[in-house]
C-alpha cells in the first residue's frame, strides 16, 4: 500500500503528527514546511541502511520536529544528525565519549534525544548531562 502524500500534507497542515515511510516518501520539503507552520511532528520510519548524511538533509528542514524511528549508535554520524535537529534514540552501550557533545548538540539544535544503555555513566554524570541538556535529553 502506498502512502497518500496529499493526506499526509493535509494532516500536517492541520497540526496532526504523522509517520512517513522513508522509502515511499515524496516531496519532503513540503511536509517539513507544513510541519514548521503547524507545529506538527514527523516520524520517519523504514530508514535502516540510510546514510546519516542523507538523514541530516531531511531533519535539518524542520529541526526538533523530525523523529527518526530507529536506535542509533553513539558515534560521529549520529552526532551530526543531532546537530541538524533530529529527534532520536541513541544507544550508549559502548560507553561513547561523545555523549557530552551529543547533549550539547541536542540543546543547541532543538533536537530531543533519548539515551539508552548508559550503564557506564554514574548517576552523578547522568544528572550533570540532564542539567546540561534540559528538556532536550532523557536517559532510560
Question: What are these model-predicted stretches?
Answer:
Residues 1-140:
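General marker for long, soluble alpha-helical cores
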